[in-house]
Amino acid sequence: MISGLFKLSNKQSVLQNATKLVLQRRTFFNIVPNPSVGLTEDQKQFQSMALDFAQEKMKPFAEKWDKEEYFPRDVMREAAELGFGGIYVREDVGGSGLSRLDASIIIEALASADVSTTAFISIHNMCAGLIDIYGTEEQRKKFLPSLVSMEKIASYCLTEPGSGSDAGSLSTKATKDGDHYILNGSKAFISGGGDSEVYLVMVRTGAEKGPKGISCLLVEKDTPGLSFGKKEEKLGWNTQPTRALIFEDCRVPVGNLIGKEGQGFSIAMNALNGGRINIGACSLGGAQSCLVAARDHVKVRKQFNQPLEHFQAVQFKMADMATKLHASRIMIRNAAAMLDAKDPSAHVYIAMAKLFACDECFKVTDDSLQLFGGYGYLKDYPVERYLRDLRVHRILEGSDAVMRLIISRELSKDDH
């Protein structure tokens, strides 16, 4: 159902503004592969809404935001007015109540203009979705309305300085003391760190080593004992701040426990399943824009007295790029549909989709830069920004190696 997405008055203004964006939209869709192929009419409608928003509110400023490392919270709040702050949060607290497949379509469209900002919107949605699924009614009503509107934003906190891919070895400790937990430890590479008002933090509450002793706590920004490291300087994703979180005798109410004690690792992995689809969708959006840019460039750029598109090598390269992008999109959307259907093997197909899409979309972006020649290396053109932003997708939400591990473990089972 999509009523939550369209219930706000902003729907009409966005649809009215769509006329002036029609040429940009046609450019995005009038190419093989067409991102709207196979979608329902409802899905096409909110895909167009997301694309119009991206073209009008994000694309004209993305280069400036990247250069100045500006975190566009004002624009994200505008996105939330369209329902993009709680895409799969239930409607009773203001969410849009959409599926993970629907979310992937929206995220791809937004990322076509600005991968970095869209990736943070995805992370925020992941956090809101976890509270909606695992939180108590009291927690849902306390936290979700302000998160769905993006008046407050949320960050996901799993990685630590000493535990990346081996998430089950995390060491941030939460010791129970009456009606509070006392947290000590740190988290690394946290998107939104220092700016977000709400942090979903995976901590060790039990004595057991490994995943069984991990729990999930909601920590608010102004909690005494919580501090932040320096803002990291990064290759890409420059429109969102990244900092470490430091807990020093940080007292968090027991009432901020999400789910049950010991359930945190399961919650974290569930979050990553959705996050992997979203980050793959971000890769799709960036690669689609690069393919369009490369297609337009080879039509007008001439060498040896003819346009580049007349050379068979360029034609075949473009054909390969389009095929990689289309295959990636099919895999991401299939994985999202499996997650919606609660298919028990969804995590394996999600790993395949994330691995393939993030790798191949990065190659499409790199090939686009190559087709631009020296111009592609200049910041006058957006392809280099997409390339920098897409590179990290092969590391976060589970690296390429971790995806291969998940897939190979499933292949080695005898009970299929």
Swiss-Prot record:
Annotated localization: Mitochondrion
Keywords: Activator, Branched-chain amino acid catabolism, FAD, Flavoprotein, Mitochondrion, Oxidoreductase, Transit peptide
Active site as annotated: E397 (proton acceptor)
Pfam families xrefs: Acyl-CoA_dh_1, Acyl-CoA_dh_M, Acyl-CoA_dh_N
Catalysed reaction equations from the record: 2-methylpropanoyl-CoA + oxidized [electron-transfer flavoprotein] + H(+) = 2-methylpropenoyl-CoA + reduced [electron-transfer flavoprotein]; (2S)-2-methylbutanoyl-CoA + oxidized [electron-transfer flavoprotein] + H(+) = (2E)-2-methylbut-2-enoyl-CoA + reduced [electron-transfer flavoprotein]; propanoyl-CoA + oxidized [electron-transfer flavoprotein] + H(+) = acryloyl-CoA + reduced [electron-transfer flavoprotein]
Organelle targeting peptide span: 1-21
Main subcellular location: mitochondrion
Top EC class of this enzyme: oxidoreductase
Annotated positions binding FAD: 156-165, 189-191, 301, 311-312, 370-374, 399-401
Catalytic activity, EC: 1.3.8.-
Cofactor(s) annotated in UniProt: FAD
GO molecular function annotations of the record: flavin adenine dinucleotide binding; short-chain 2-methyl fatty acyl-CoA dehydrogenase activity
Pathway(s) this gene product operates in, as recorded in its UniProt entry: Amino-acid degradation; L-valine degradation
Biological-process GO terms, alphabetical: lipid metabolic process; valine catabolic process
Domain of life: Eukaryota
One GO cellular component, as annotated: mitochondrion
Classification via InterPro entries: Acyl-CoA_DH_CS, Acyl-CoA_Oxase/DH_mid-dom, Acyl-CoA_Oxase/DH_mid-dom_sf, AcylCo_DH-like_C, AcylCo_DH/oxidase_C, AcylCoA_DH/ox_N, AcylCoA_DH/ox_N_sf, AcylCoA_DH/oxidase_NM_dom_sf
Binding residues for substrate: S165, N273, G274, G275, R276, R409
Entry's family note: Belongs to the acyl-CoA dehydrogenase family.
Subunit structure and binding partners: Homotetramer.
Function: Isobutyryl-CoA dehydrogenase which catalyzes one of the steps of the valine catabolic pathway. To a lesser extent, is also able to catalyze the oxidation of (2S)-2-methylbutanoyl-CoA.
Protein name, UniProt field: Isobutyryl-CoA dehydrogenase, mitochondrial
Organism: Dictyostelium discoideum
Name of the gene: acad8
